[in-house]
Structures are given as C-alpha cells and as structure tokens.
Amino acid sequence: MGKFKKLGIILTSTAFSVGVLSPMAQASANVKDSPERIEIQVASTETKVTKSTLIKKLRELFPEKFNFLTDNDFYTGRGHYYNDDKTIRYDLSFQKTVNGKDVYGSITFMGDDLDLESFYYQPANVADALYPAKYSKDDAQKIAQDFLKKFPNTANYKLQENDFDYGFNYTRPLSEPITYSFSYAPTHNGVTLSNHTISIGVLANGEVVQVYRNSNVSKKATFDGVEQKKSEADVLAQVRDNFAVELRYYLDYNYPSDKREVKLVYMPTSSFYGVHALTGQWQTANGFVAQAPSVKGVEKLASEQLDPRKPGMTVEEVEEFAKSFLKVDPDKAKLQIEMVDERENENGETLYSVSYMYMYENGGSGASFEINKATGEITQYYDVSRDFVQSDSKAEKITKDAALAKAIDYLKEWAPSYIHNYAKPLEDYGYDNYGNQYGFSFPRVVNGIPVVGDEIYVSVGTDGSLRGLNINQQKIDNWPSVSKAVSADKAKETFSDALKLKLQYTKQDKEDSNHYDLVYAPSYEGSIYNQIDALTGKWVSSADDSNNKPQISHPTAAEELNYLLAQNVLEVKDPASFNADTAITKGEALKIILKSLTYGYYGYGNEEETYQSFNNIDPKHPLYGIVEQAVRMGVLQPADEFAVDATLTRQELAEWFIRVLRLESAAKHNDIYKLNFADAGSIDPAYAGYVALASAMGLIDAQQNNFNATEKVSYADLAVSTLRLARAIHENNTGRNYFY
C-alpha cells in the first residue's frame, strides 16, 4: 500500500482476547501483554483506500442489510497501525436515527485486501431479541457458522468451548437484548492454534451484530508434527512434579461501578505456560527452556519511601520540563508543546497531561505524557521519537539484565516516591521484536503479597533508552487478611486434582517466526487462568455444567424461572426441590427485580458518603445496597423501617413496577381509574392507579377477573411479571439510568 506518514498517536488500552464481544478484565498475571497498545495514525494522502471502497466492502459482507443508509451517512478516519503490528487498518462508522431510534455501527478493515477485523452494529429494532427470544442459541450458532464462511480460508476453523469471562462480574439487565457469542479458532492436524480466533455475536433476533478477528495465520506457517508427541500422561506427571501455587492479591474490575475489588487468591505459578509436546521443554515468556523455571521471591525496589522528584510543580515548570525531557535533535524534528492540561484520576490525584507534537519533513507524530502534580513524577510516557529517529543498527544491544538495571534506574529518577510499594519482576521479561525493546512489569506488594492488576510497566530500548513508563497505582483501603487464607498445600492439592492438559499450537513472539510449536497447556477446573479463593478454598470460576444443572419444575412458570436461574438473577440452592409457589418476601423480591434491571452494582459513586433511608437497613445489612438503589430509582420511599421479611402483596408489586417505569405521577390520580375487577372493592384506593396501569400494560394478570390485591406474590408470579416488566422497560426506553 505504499509508504505512510505518521501524523499522530493515540494511547489506548486494548483487551486482546475478546475484542468487541465482551469487555474482559486481564485474566492472569502470566499473560504476556504490554500495558498499552499504541495506535499510530497515517496520513490520508498516503493511502488509496477511499470511503466508497470501504462502503462497497461492507455491503458485500452484508448484502441489503444497510440499504437504509446512503454514502453520506458513513464516516471514515485516517488509517492507523499499531506499534506491535504494522498492518494498516481503516475505520468506517455510521450513526442515524430511524423511526425515532438510534442506529449505530463501526467497522474496521485491515491490510491490502481489506479483510474485516471488527464489526459492531446496534440496530433499531431488537424486540425479538428479548425474552422470549425468537432464536435459540442453537439457531444462532448456525447463523454464526454461515457468516464464518464469508471469511476466506476458514474451512478448518472449529467452534471453541467458551472459556470463562474471567474477572467480568455483572448481571445483564434483562431489558437488554440477548446476544449469543461464538468463538472459532483455526486448527491444523486437528489441533487448535492458540491466539487466533474469529468471534461472532448474534442477537436472539437472528442478526449478526458483533465480529472480531484476532490475527491471521501466515501462508508461510510451518507446524510441528503430531506423530512424535509425548503422551499426555507423561507430561501431566511432569507438570505435577514441578507444580507450585502462589498467593496473590487480585484486583477484579467491576465494569458497571468503574471500581476495583480486591480478592486474595491462590494462582498456579506464572513461571511457565506449558510443555513442548515433542521435547518436553518448558514454555516461558521468551521461548522454551530445559529446566523447570524456579519461582522468584519478592524483592522490593526500595525498603522505604524515597523523596518525591519535585513536589508541587506548576504549569510553567511542567512546560519547561517537557521541553527538556522531550528534546530531540532539531535536525530530525521540531518539538511543539501543544497544551498542558490538568485532570483528576480515580484516586483523586491531580495529573498534568502534556500534549506535544514532533514536526518533521512531510509529517509529524504526537502524543501526551502525564506528571503527578503533587510529586512531579512521570506516571505515563511513550517515546514517540523512535518513529522518526533511527537507532544505530550496528550498535551493541544491551542484555536483559542491563535493561532491567536501566529500568530500575529510570524509576528511581522519574518516579522515586512510588517504588517502595513495588518489587522486582516476578515474571520473565518481555522482548518486543518490532520495537527492539525489553518490557518489565514491577508488581505492587501489600502485606508481602504481590498484587495482580497493579503493576508499573517500563520498557527499555536495546540502546538503553527509556521507551515507555506507565504507573496506575490503585487506591484500595481494605485488603483481605492473609492470616485467614487456607493453606498453600490444600490449594496445591485442589489445583493438582483439577489439572488437565490441552494440546495446542503456539507461535513464539518473534517478528520473523512463522513456526507453530506443539504444546501441552495446563488448565484448571476448565480454565487456563483459574484461581482459588484463598479465604474459602473454592474455585473462583467453576466449569460450566449448565446442561446438567437441575431445573426448577413448575406447571406454568418453569421457563421463566429457569431463565432467571440461568441469568444468575434467581438464587436457589436446590432447584430440583424448589417450591416456586412459595410466597416471596419484600427483600428477596426487591433483590430479584433489581438484579433483573441493573448490572448488579448497588453502591454510591462516592463511597465515603453513606446514606441510610431506613433505620433497620444500615450499611452492614446484606440488602443495604439493593434497598438504597431502589430508593434512588424511586421504587421505595425513605421511612422509619422497610419490612424486608414481610411477604409482598400483588398491589404492592404493582406499585413497584409502575415506579420502575416512572409512571407514578399518572398512577397517583387514582380517582380517574375505573377498576373492572370483580374484587375491585378489596383494592386499597392508594394502590388503585398502580393496579390499573400494571394490569392494562399486562405486567400482572388478573385471576378469573379477580386481582386479589392482598394475596401474596409467589416466586413463580414474580418471575413471569419481572420478564414482562423488562420488555416494557425496553419498549418505553425508561431503564437507561438504572444501569450502574
């Protein structure tokens, strides 16, 4: 596609494993990823790809699907590539209002052939994708399989068993459409290739709405043969003999609340990823080794806190520092400081964000770096100058040990007050062949335990230069007590009993490597990245045996009850013996309703501010968050007490539902409603408007023309009515502010 010019640079954090299908947290400390993927834009004048070309490509993939769009409805951006992948991408997007509803889409094509890399589509009408769904998962799988055929050379792609959405803990509001996700991976000799997937999301109305393609397999690829592989039993014994577990704090990201939650867990050792199926060598971050890697001990970077670099920096001082810090040979480029801005991070700290550009012949590159205002220390930096300053290819490259020493020196120079909380890398270094640089991850240490999800990342060029620095220290007030952890021996035994091996092909991270090694990769209780809760001794994630789970039996509401059970809305210890006709308490009913309509987080934006709407529901009460969320939604009104253990009546449920729909203003005018029920006289006048609306909207059915206002609501009743409420919310678009 010809030569390209770099015009700008955008720092973006990227979830590599699942793309657009679901935002997942980092699965494990033993996944070798850079903390940030750098998107570099190229000049539009240097590419022959036009908007019309991209639109034509889209219409070829989806014939007639987007006929309601004109070419003027589409938008394009400049082409871009990544620091670790020079293939140029081209973005196409659209947004339009159709019959009063927003329609949105974004598409990315890549390479000379404009292969589809990602696709996301939000259609106007998704009513058929709500419960009860028009298409089953099996139906959707057939649709996904047919769409897969649109990609070239995918005949050998096989559907993958769903791995856990690790660390991704929320319930989907039932007012949102059902999306079935399928992941396909290429195979060779019947063996799956790791890190190569095509993920396809299909709405329950049959529309393909999400696609993500994670890297292509080169036509030059070579593969180990499977004929001489070692037996699985021998390798399993080898792994068990060298197996170890490690105690870790794990920061689990809660997406709806935008907060971190800390767990104390046992994890398998991160010193190896698998065993070569032919040689028996151990797979590490940087290739295969003959001896089993040893587990490293914690070695702090500093025994006590060092003085901050320059406390209380002013804007003027930051600008002058930037001119010096970012200085390059003026014959190579001219530095322009565009802006020094202030922002507050999630810890409440003020950061200076310095935006700058290097202007050089025929183009320029730009980025921003950040400085902590209170300490004057760099918290985020990426060396853009490497894009136009060529290093001496004949110069001797420093070793990994020398690079590590350089990285520590840079931290002492540019972020000294942080490093007493961090330790030397516990994992092997990473080497980036594209950028000719070493990458190091320095874990935070609390109570002598390394923290997964809070690391300092430093990259050092083979010439010894600082290529990147990233600090994102999390503010966590409460860390689980290590003294309450189950023994490491018990955790090791649990891991060992659950250990299984998966045969797969993996490619080493080398720029010129097209060879795939045959590797046995360990998995635990069905997941490569599983963990054991150190406080309970139980798996954080359990193997999905949903097809074998006991089902709830009921003559009229079995489907609704089991759907809520599958969605983790309804919690039942023994579904097979559960009596769904049991009257439900107000507390339990409120919990089910809110879990059905929200993402499952019931906290305040500012956790230091606590509210108590009822005297008997204090912050320590198990339903405190749910009750307070219901108050914020207007479902409940503050009062002296909330009768959490009292059974819920049908007229009370009607009021809650109408308040959820924000129709209480209309319902309050009870004198305008005529109730045609045979038992209308038994309905409390205060509830008359709510009952009338709930009945008219089909949320709560009458029973032989009797509303039975004071009768108790059963679990079965609530299941049926809650799913009807979810559909009403979707149709009336009244739920958007509930999804915290």
Q: What is each model feature region?
A:
Residues S17-A27, S541-A558, E571-K586, L594-Y624, ...:
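Feature responds to low-complexity, polar/acidic, surface-exposed segments characteristic
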Residues I40-T76, A133-R172, T222-Y255, A302-D341, ...:
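Short, non-transmembrane alpha-helical segments in secretory-pathway proteins
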Residues L61-D112, L159-A204, Y249-Q281, V328-A374, ...:
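Exposed beta-strand-loop-beta-strand "reactive/processing" segments of non-cytosolic proteins
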Residues P63, Q145, K149-N153, K323, ...:
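Sec-exported extracytoplasmic/periplasmic mature domains
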Residues T97-K142, K149-Y157, T192-K230, S271-E299, ...:
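Extended intrinsically disordered, low-complexity coil regions enriched in Ser, Thr, Gly, Ala
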